[in-house]
Amino acid sequence: MGEKYKAYRSVKYHLPQRSWAWNLYGAGMENMGKNGEPEPFSIPQSSDDQLLVRIDSVGVCFSDVKILKQGGSHPKLYNRNLSVEPTRLGHEVSLTVVKVGKNLAGEFQPGQRLAVQPDIYQNGISTAYGYTIPGGLAQYHLIGKEVLETDAGACLLPMHDSMGYAESALLEPWGCVVAAYTQRRRLDPKTGGTMWIIGPPDNTTEFTFSKGLDSPATIVLTDAPPSIKKLASATQAKVIERNNLAPDGFETISRELTDGKGFDDIVMLNPTSANVVGQVARLIARRGTLNLVGAKPLDGLVQVDFGRLHYDYIAFMGNASLDIAASYGEERNRCELRAGRTAVFVGAGGPMGQMHIQRALELPDGPQLVIATEISDERLQTLSDMFAPLAEKHNRTILLFNPNTARQSFRDFVMQATQSQGADDVVVCVPFAALMAEGDTVMKPDGMLVFFAGVPNGTMGAVNLSNVYLSNAQYTGTSGLTIHDQASVMERRIAGTLSPGRSVAAIGGLETAADAIQSVIDSKYPGKVVIFPQIHNLPLISLRELKDRLPEVAAKLGEDMMWTNEAEEALIEKFWQEPA
């Protein structure tokens, strides 16, 4: 370990008199910093309940672009006047503790390395780091109760000694990817909730409800068969009957019985009309469920709110037996890619799509065939360069498809590659409802469709919900992450089953932050851009350019030009200047 790198890691040096930072004073690039440059600020003194931290690395994200474009009108800035109360971008952050307030001495220590979990809530309100709370595009700043005392506790994750600075920052985007394959949906009837059971009129089928009917506090029955009425009356729940309802009356009873919040759990028995199912689906509460139980397909595709699948975690489930409860539970409702099968990633050429592909290829029990779509031939070539060797290394196959230039349709391509079976899993990485709906058409009847990218609530699309109860198809979506998701990425990195550093495509010093954000707008680099705020005079440079421009750093890159801890050490040895 070089002397400069050793001093940097230990934080045993005199702090500088000032810290440089990129404040955001409004919408637009012209409001980032002062005159297009970072500003100097005095390094603040920490109170008894605060940490003074050094920012080591910051990943640049398209979410930063959204904040830059919207300014104070961004949903997580609550119409703040940024010219008076500026914020600071940077939510993918790795940091080192410099000073510890005396009330925190038992929890933190100088030199401790941490990653930020930025998806912060306080009293149920989003106060995200890098949004509401000024973020990491600075050299030093204070951390207090706004990060340490949140609804989820302290939003700081201690780093393993083997973790590099860049890969520690990238735990955040990688955590979002991992979260897409963890169970976010509620899969059992809600305790104390409101359940609505809808049956076709004059139905005498002897349905059962082997477990879970004792959970709701209120059960609403609409044209329920006698068997269900009997089961409901045997519970402690309040039972309400509303029969002979037309679809235009559904919203009225939702307002009456749920204050417009929607039903926590809805059960539809022997559904036949896709239109009716679609109308009912609009009334699912946040994190609510719609359980379809029947043996015959609907009369068409169902219009589903794609935004709510992603942001509200609504769950569609079902089965073809007479036991309503057979639809519930994690065993029946998967969230992970199928081992040894086929996974399709739609719009996979961007940094996040690349992470999904990498995870699938490195997953020990991952899919055997990975299909990636992208409309840019340049990005497709990047995917080939990055992942063809990785696929070969893990004895997997990767196929690439450009729908704009191919002679066959996307569906025909997938069907040809899967012997007309369709894909087991389809992950949509771009926020376009048409592509989300198209993803449903290439899926096996028992496949899984994952909406990783979000579209606004109210964005509708047609899907085949008959497959939910006839074949156990899954429809899922996720937004954000937890600190446990970041921790799981670190655990896999330590175990050698995931390489976050492979996502790094370009690096830069503090002064390049604005250019780095512009590069994301322009899709200039084929992966993540990482800023090192403690380094001055480092231009924004792609890893492909290092061989010619910084050969001593390039020499430390890993296979396939992967960013490594050794490259990071060489970078710090060359550029970091210990404060005088």
Label every PLM stretch briefly.
Residues 163-247, 334-404:
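Mid-domain Rossmann-like dinucleotide-binding core that forms the NAD(H)/NADP(H) cofactor-binding site
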Residues 79-82, 91, 118-195, 316-319, ...:
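NAD(P)H dinucleotide-binding glycine-rich loop of Rossmann-like/cofactor-binding domains
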Residues 2-17, 246-256, 260-261, 265-282, ...:
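C-terminal hydrophobic helical "lid"/dimerization subdomain
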Residues 275-278, 294-313, 437, 453-472:
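Rossmann-fold NAD(P)-binding glycine/threonine-rich loop
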Residues 92, 112-113, 140, 289, ...:
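Residue-level marker of beta-strand positions
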Residues 268-271, 284-301, 425-430, 441-460, ...:
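ADP-ribose/adenylate-binding Rossmann-like module
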Residues 42-59, 73-120, 135, 160:
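Glycine-rich beta-strand-centered segment in the early N-terminal region that forms part
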